[in-house]
Amino acid sequence: MENTVLRTLEALKANRMEAYYAENKQEALDTVLSLIEKDNSVASGGSMTLKEIGLIDALKNHGYDYWDRADIKDPADYPAFFRKSLTADVYLSSSNAITENGELYNVDGNSNRVAAMLYGPKSVIVVAGINKIVKDLDEAALRVKTVAAPLNTKRLAKILASKVKVGDVIIKDILGTGIDVVAARSLA
């Protein structure tokens, strides 16, 4: 394990967080599942990391009480769902960046992850790859602007494009990146 990773793990612990290191996706999945009681209610923020390690599928397919926002069909129901998520026993998320000083850096469009981390469930589990480790808060902000926001913009543009109706146009500049989400779809 690299010195940077070790320093970051120790800094997270010094900041009163439990910190674990996993060699691979399966080990990460097993570690997270070991931290969740089977009878706990579980909610999560939108996170590719959680999907990539197989956590969302494991929760859905192995009897966990997982509250899945993908089940929401009407966008008007999202605010109520986000509020409900704050009452779950466990909240799962990732972070946009983690500093070597053990600081979690998050920028959210809906503030659901940040709200859950600060005011939500007693148990919040953050799953993040070592690619998210940065030196300090300045590098964290830069990572959001140059890596996380552009990737999320592309991912969310595809999702939005699949849900809009003819004539709908959605334009949003994400974090001043100059990358606009423009979603429109013709049903023809």
Predicted regions located by residue number:
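N-terminal active-site beta-alpha-beta segment that forms phosphate/nucleotide-binding
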Residues: 2-82, 87-92
